């Protein structure tokens, strides 16, 4: 028995050495950037805090430099950290790294829509979507009027709270939801509409779940975890329900489609589908249209909603900043006229606060994963085709040199010595390059106009002492999720 035990131990030891040797050969087969040595099967997963991956990546960057390699499960990942490396990848090598890295929880939609599409259609679908969004007012007066109209409805709903505590999640969220719904579907919801609240609940829940440790682990080990129960199933179910809604809207539009008189973005996409009716390989299928609409609906609602909600929490933490905003609004806009885009140039403090909110909350800290579209030489390293590339946006937004004391909320980060707004090239909250957020112009306009409208009419009142307000996210992964809170809004007149 003793001899058998020694033999088994020896065989295990030899097998381990062989496995490590093979792993080293694979690991060194490319001239990859440096990084921590991966453990077979697990890779570097134990060197990451799944509750705060961005923080773990920052620590690794201090050790291995601004470009380093990780292995997570079977996935090879190159991380870019810091302004120079991130800008170089997103702008100077935008074509080589324009692919979308796999996100297994969205695997079903890998080659459809805009956000998660890594197939042959994504460039054309994205280009056309940008074009029609601009035609329907992206960055122009059309969207300004939409947002101003919705700001009026939002203010009226806030008045109905009569100074009593309320959770702002869905009440505030209805405003950006209605703006994007009008653009996509020529549709506006009442603030108590059951379907609207149901959709926003799906958006909100998914944004939270995507940022939890389980989903982070699932996206690295989906080959094994897909068979287990877990929140990945809930995310997929929610996505399916959202897509069923957009598919229903597309079918509804198709019944009354006039190709000479499009009513909204949905009609524009359907018209393209009609043009391809006899194509052997149509790009605009009903499925692709429904996923594209779902992408735009989710992104156009949840990101702006979360940013506004986080912004209100921050302003309650710093009432002196809120007071300065009231003074600027009263001086430039007054009590009755609707805030307008043209006011931004005369409201540097509000402009700075809006930018600082986006910088400070770090909404999508690690960016969505990119992918190398071909073998690429980058800074002397060879990054093979198919490698996942993560340009960390938080490494720009929290750069100590550009934003002194970056962990503190300071509108002065975007103001010069004369109190004028100061642009920073480090501000890449919407990413950059080929995969920059298609709704950046709309989101910037919404944040400025909606926040200005709220503060024009109301004082914010916290239910706790401002110094006790916790601004740290409840979870951070795919996104930075603010803690739940209630507040009161007190009419100013």
Curated annotation (Swiss-Prot):
It catalyses: an organic molecule + reduced [NADPH--hemoprotein reductase] + O2 = an alcohol + oxidized [NADPH--hemoprotein reductase] + H2O + H(+); (5Z,8Z,11Z)-eicosatrienoate + reduced [NADPH--hemoprotein reductase] + O2 = 19-hydroxy-(5Z,8Z,11Z)-eicosatrienoate + oxidized [NADPH--hemoprotein reductase] + H2O + H(+); (5Z,8Z,11Z,14Z,17Z)-eicosapentaenoate + reduced [NADPH--hemoprotein reductase] + O2 = 19-hydroxy-(5Z,8Z,11Z,14Z,17Z)-eicosapentaenoate + oxidized [NADPH--hemoprotein reductase] + H2O + H(+); (4Z,7Z,10Z,13Z,16Z,19Z)-docosahexaenoate + reduced [NADPH--hemoprotein reductase] + O2 = 21-hydroxy-(4Z,7Z,10Z,13Z,16Z,19Z)-docosahexaenoate + oxidized [NADPH--hemoprotein reductase] + H2O + H(+). Induction: By ethanol and acetone in the liver and by testosterone in the kidney and adrenal tissues. PROSITE patterns: CYTOCHROME_P450 (PS00086). Transmembrane segments: none annotated. Highest level in the liver and to a lesser extent in the kidney, with a higher level in the male kidney than in the female. It is an enzyme of class 1 (oxidoreductase). The keyword Oxidoreductase applies. GO terms for molecular function: 4-nitrophenol 2-monooxygenase activity; enzyme binding; heme binding; Hsp70 protein binding; Hsp90 protein binding; iron ion binding; long-chain fatty acid omega-1 hydroxylase activity; monooxygenase activity. Keywords: Endoplasmic reticulum, Fatty acid metabolism, Heme, Iron, Lipid metabolism, Membrane, Metal-binding, Microsome, Mitochondrion, Mitochondrion inner membrane, Monooxygenase, NADP, Oxidoreductase. GO terms for cellular component: endoplasmic reticulum; endoplasmic reticulum membrane; mitochondrial inner membrane. Pathway: Lipid metabolism; fatty acid metabolism. Gene3D superfamilies: Cytochrome P450 (1.10.630.10). Its EC number is 1.14.14.1, 1.14.13.n7. Substrate binds at residues 298-303. Coiled coil: none annotated. It holds the Pfam family p450. GO terms for biological process: 4-nitrophenol metabolic process; lipid hydroxylation; long-chain fatty acid metabolic process; monoterpenoid metabolic process; response to bacterium; steroid metabolic process; xenobiotic metabolic process. InterPro entries: Cyt_P450 (IPR001128), Cyt_P450_CS (IPR017972), Cyt_P450_E_grp-I (IPR002401), Cyt_P450_E_grp-I_CYP2E-like (IPR008070), Cyt_P450_sf (IPR036396), Cytochrome_P450_fam2 (IPR050182). Belongs to the cytochrome P450 family. A cytochrome P450 monooxygenase involved in the metabolism of fatty acids. Mechanistically, uses molecular oxygen inserting one oxygen atom into a substrate, and reducing the second into a water molecule, with two electrons provided by NADPH via cytochrome P450 reductase (NADPH--hemoprotein reductase). Catalyzes the hydroxylation of carbon-hydrogen bonds. Hydroxylates fatty acids specifically at the omega-1 position displaying the highest catalytic activity for saturated fatty acids. May be involved in the oxidative metabolism of xenobiotics. This is Cytochrome P450 2E1. It comes from Mus musculus (Mouse). The gene is Cyp2e1.
């Amino acid at each position: 028995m003793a001899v058998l035990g020694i033999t088994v131990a020896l065989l295990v030891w030899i097998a381990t050495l062989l496995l490590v040797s093979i792993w080293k050969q694979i690991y060194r087969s490319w001239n990859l950037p440096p990084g921590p040595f991966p453990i077979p099967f697990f890779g570097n997963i134990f060197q990451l805090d799944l509750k705060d991956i961005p923080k773990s990546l920052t620590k690794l960057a201090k050790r291995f430099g601004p470009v380093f390699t990780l292995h997570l499960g079977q996935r090879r990942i190159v991380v870019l950290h810091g302004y120079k490396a991130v800008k170089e990848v997103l702008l100077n090598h935008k074509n080589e790294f324009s692919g979308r890295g796999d996100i297994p929880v969205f695997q079903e939609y890998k080659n459809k829509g805009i956000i998660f599409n890594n197939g042959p259609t994504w460039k054309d679908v994205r280009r056309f979507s940008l074009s029609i969004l601009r035609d329907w007012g992206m960055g122009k007066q059309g969207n300004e009027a939409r947002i101003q109209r919705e700001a009026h409805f939002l203010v009226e709903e806030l008045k109905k709270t009569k100074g009593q505590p309320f959770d702002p999640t869905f009440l505030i969220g209805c405003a950006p939801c209605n703006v994007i719904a009008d653009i996509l579907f020529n549709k506006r919801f009442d603030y108590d509409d059951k379907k609207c609240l149901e959709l926003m609940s799906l958006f909100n829940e998914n944004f939270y779940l995507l940022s939890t440790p389980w989903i982070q682990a699932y996206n690295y080990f989906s080959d094994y975890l897909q068979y287990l129960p877990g929140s990945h199933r809930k995310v997929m179910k929610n996505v399916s329900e959202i897509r069923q809604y957009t598919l229903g809207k597309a079918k509804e539009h198709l019944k009354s489609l006039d190709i000479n008189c499009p009513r909204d973005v949905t009609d524009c996409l359907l018209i393209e589908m009609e043009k391809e009716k006899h194509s052997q390989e149509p790009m605009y299928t009903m499925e692709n249209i429904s996923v594209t609409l779902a992408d735009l609906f989710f992104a156009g609602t949840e990101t702006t909603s979360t940013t506004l909600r986080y912004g209100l929490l921050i302003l309650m933490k710093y009432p002196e900043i809120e007071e300065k905003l009231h003074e600027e609004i009263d001086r430039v806009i007054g009590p009755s006229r609707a805030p307008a885009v043209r006011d931004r140039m005369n409201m540097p403090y509000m402009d700075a606060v809006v930018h600082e909110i986006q910088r400070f909350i770090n909404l999508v800290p690690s960016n969505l994963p990119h992918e190398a579209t071909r073998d690429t030489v980058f800074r002397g390293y060879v990054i093979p085709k198919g490698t996942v590339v993560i340009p960390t946006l938080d490494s720009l937004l929290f750069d100590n040199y550009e934003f002194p004391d970056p962990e503190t909320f300071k509108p002065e980060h975007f103001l010069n010595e004369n109190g004028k707004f100061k642009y920073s090239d480090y501000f890449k909250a919407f990413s950059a390059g080929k995969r920059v957020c298609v709704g950046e112009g709309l989101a910037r306009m919404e944040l400025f106009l909606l926040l200005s409208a709220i503060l024009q009419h109301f004082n914010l009142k916290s239910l706790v002492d401002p110094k006790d307000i916790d601004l740290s996210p409840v979870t951070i992964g795919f996104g930075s999720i603010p803690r739940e809170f209630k507040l009161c809004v007190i009419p100013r007149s």
